[in-house]
A protein has these predicted regions:
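Amphipathic alpha-helical elements of HEAT/ARM-like alpha-solenoid repeat scaffolds that form extended
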Residues: 51-52, 105-124, 160-165
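Eukaryote-biased recognition of C-terminal alpha-helical segments
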Residues: 145-180
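Amphipathic alpha-helical segments within extended alpha-helical solenoids and repeat-rich scaffolds
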Residues: 74-81, 138-148
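Charged, low-complexity interaction regions
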Residues: 62-66, 124-131, 153
């Protein structure tokens, strides 16, 4: 439901819907925006929880809400912490880091999806993504791009072969989103 001219929120008892999303989001994210049935969807699982929390954050803080403040508050309580250096690694180093432990991949992927969901949730709620939100979304996207290159022996993810095209779709949304 629309609670102000600026913010669109979903009904907590309903699924993601075009009627409760900013038109910019619906226009830019038609490929994945309303069908969060797989773990590739940026608003499923971690992303759904992030979106619901972000909606609460915007509802509580109104016009002063900042999506990245929500993300920072959310990640403060997470353990284990992903080393800050991991977010800036190039693909070969990120693959090596992922491959050291299945848990590295699990935790980094979860946090990456949360960063993406924050950026896309901001677009869904407000109709634009802040520069800081876009930077966080790109961090998440860049951390997920090497996933298909991780040796299959470390972790078999059933959607691994679909990751490149799904991430390309998400990247296109980030590239096309209004910055605000």
């Amino acid at each position: 439901m629309e609670t102000s001219q600026k913010h669109y929120f979903d009904d907590a008892d309903e699924a993601l819907s075009p009627e409760t999303s900013r038109p910019n989001f619906v226009k830019l994210a038609p490929v994945f925006s309303m069908t969060p049935e797989t773990s590739l969807h940026p608003l499923s699982d971690d992303g759904h929880d992030t979106l619901r929390g972000l909606e609460e954050w915007f509802s509580e803080h109104g016009g002063t809400a900042v999506a990245t403040d929500y993300l920072e508050a959310l990640l403060t309580g997470w353990a284990p912490k992903i080393p800050a250096r991991a977010w800036g690694l190039d693909a070969p180093k990120l693959i090596a880091w992922h491959s050291k432990s299945e848990m590295n991949e699990v935790f980094l992927a979860s946090e990456a999806r949360t960063r993406l969901a924050t950026a896309l949730g901001e677009l869904k709620i407000t109709g634009s993504i802040s520069p800081a939100g876009l930077a966080e979304g790109r961090k998440g996207l860049n951390a997920l791009r090497p996933v298909p290159q991780i040796p299959r022996g470390t972790r078999h993810w059933p959607y691994r072969d679909e990751v490149p095209s799904a991430l390309a779709d998400i990247g296109n949304v980030l590239d096309s989103a209004p910055i605000g």
